Design a protein with these regions (language model features):
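Peripheral, non-AAA+ core regions of ATP-driven protein-machinery
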Residues: 1-230
């Protein structure tokens, strides 16, 4: 900590040794914003920058699978689409397990409580495992909606259409709250060929019509979002 006060910039290198991707975050920057993020790929000749991380972080082909939802996220200053994976199964060993990789476990528990209380899905006796594909650690609250969608997709064993993505923060009463920089998220989804994106209804005000052809589906409650997906 003493050294951090002396230097102008502190960078943090993230990523486990079993994953090919590494993330470079700015923790301290005396001369600019700390909202910076770089994604690199480990190759045989060393680290190389990833110009379009969205294409690498999404499953290519292989058919539609349950328990997968695509989130339009923003980390640092760049938007990209990430794959949220969930597995829900009946607890076989007493106390149900809750596990999250790349996502805050306390927030996952909060979202599961919202599903129980506000939507009526009984998950108290289910094991729930959540994973953010690519080894990323995401803090953007806009992926709340995709987490809920992935969990319910796995619970009912029904796949979500592969050309739909979503962005929205989920509140304790089950409302879908507006998120920042929604225009960038929509543009990124359109660029990658998605036909529809679910966004908070509160983000419609002042939203410019995207140049690319993509259907914008506004939702204000978790229940409304689920009706659009299943």
């Amino acid at each position: 900590k003493v050294l951090e006060h002396i230097v102008d910039t502190v960078l943090q290198f993230e990523g486990d040794r079993h994953n090919m991707y590494r993330i470079l975050r700015s923790i301290k920057n005396r001369f600019g914003s700390t909202a910076e993020l770089g994604i690199y790929e480990m190759r045989g000749d060393g680290l190389r920058p990833v110009d379009n991380p969205s294409e690498l972080l999404l499953t290519q082909g292989g058919g539609q699978l349950s328990g997968i939802a695509i989130a339009a996220a923003i980390e640092g200053i760049r938007p990209f689409l990430i794959e949220t994976q969930a597995l829900v199964s009946t607890a076989a060993y007493g106390t149900p397990q809750r596990s999250a990789t790349g996502f805050d476990l306390r927030r996952l528990n909060m979202l599961l409580a919202v599903l129980e209380k506000r939507v009526g899905f009984k998950l108290a006796q289910k094991d729930v495992f959540l994973n953010i594909a690519g080894g990323l650690r995401v803090t953007d609250p806009a992926i709340d909606l995709s987490v809920i969608a992935a969990v319910l997709s796995s619970n009912v064993d029904t796949a979500i259409e592969h050309n739909i993505c979503m962005a929205g923060e989920v509140g304790l009463s089950g409302e879908i709250r507006p998120v920042a920089r929604i225009g960038q998220r929509i543009s990124e989804a359109a660029k990658l060929g998605f036909s529809s994106i679910l966004i908070p209804e509160g983000n419609l005000k002042g939203l410019e019509t995207p140049k690319a052809s993509i259907e914008i589906i506004p939702v204000n409650r978790v229940e409304a979002a689920l009706r659009c997906l299943f």
